Regions:
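Terminal helix-turn-helix DNA-binding modules in bacterial transcription factors
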Residues: 189-196, 201-208, 213, 220-248
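A cytosolic small-molecule/anion-sensing beta-strand core signal
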Residues: 44, 60-61, 69, 79
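Short acidic-glycine-tyrosine-enriched beta hairpin
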Residues: 54-66
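Conserved short histidine dyad/triad with adjacent acidic residue
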Residues: 18-35
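Short, conserved beta-strand element in jelly-roll/cupin
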Residues: 33-50
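A hydrophobic/aromatic-rich effector-binding and dimerization subdomain
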Residues: 1-21, 72-143, 162, 166-171
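Regular secondary-structure segments
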Residues: 44, 132-146, 191, 195-198, ...
Length: 248
């Protein structure tokens, strides 16, 4: 499996991470990767191409795409674009998990055609337009940081979550999707614990015992799915938090 795990840390004081896509200047490729968080790409200008399970999903201005937890994907940005990225920790949807700790969303404006299993774009619905508008508002409020913005931004964020679970959540999924997700979910639980306890004296042996693995097996999990060893991954987490604290 040639893909990497992406470390995602929410913005300071907020229950999500929000930023402009790093490939906005075009001529950009993001290789296959995965993460626990749900990710929404909303294109404001230009276009992007996403690849999920080897299927291409073109995205143009005014459209969005939801990337599910543990969904391996890659991105191509051949031209200049302005794209808002919203990353939502999976725990925000705990109350809506299936028995297998699984939740999946779809984007109504980019669908699969059942006859040929290829994506087909449809005209955005009023709900799709509302979602795009909310994400624009979220980013505008985040940039302004006016007095009391923390309350306004949470109000908009929770309306986005409401649309996701009421309109875009899938209630039926294939068993193969559950199996693929479970393989990555095992490591996701460990990396989530590491992010929440990064200040502590974390050791491979201690985490292996806590989650029911041998030291050797857990070490292989990191090398296979995160593409780095345990020590490097822990250092990356601590460096990311240290950088955020330095900025603040």
């Amino acid at each position: 499996m040639e893909f990497q795990h992406e470390l995602i840390i929410p913005n300071e004081g907020l229950p999500f991470k929000l930023f402009l896509f790093e490939g906005r200047n075009g001529n950009y490729v993001r290789e296959k990767h995965w993460h626990t968080s749900i990710e929404i790409f909303t294109v404001m200008e230009g276009s992007l191409f996403f690849y999920i399970d080897e299927v291409e999903y073109p995205l143009k201005a005014g459209e969005f795409l939801i990337i599910n937890s543990n969904e391996v994907h890659s991105i191509q940005a051949p031209v200049r674009n302005e794209t808002i990225v919203l990353q939502i920790p999976l725990k925000q949807f705990t109350d809506y998990f299936t028995a297998q700790r699984f939740i999946r969303f779809h984007s109504r404006n980019v669908r699969h055609r059942e006859d040929v299993y290829a994506p087909v774009a449809s005209e955005p619905s009023e709900t799709d337009k509302r979602m795009v508008s909310l994400i624009q508002d979220l980013y505008r409020i985040y940039l302004s940081k006016e007095t009391g913005y923390e309350f306004r931004i949470r109000a908009v964020f929770y309306e986005i979550l409401y649309l996701m679970v009421s309109t875009y959540r899938e209630t039926e999924v294939e068993e193969s999707e559950l199996k693929n997700s479970r393989r990555l979910d095992a490591l996701s639980k460990i990396t989530t614990y590491m992010r929440e306890h990064y200040r502590e004296d974390l050791k491979l042996s201690g985490l292996a015992a806590m989650f029911g693995y041998s030291d050797a097996y857990l070490s292989r999990m990191f090398r296979k799915y995160a593409k780095v060893n345990f020590k490097t991954y822990l250092q990356d987490i601590r460096m990311a938090y240290a950088y955020r604290e330095l900025l603040n």
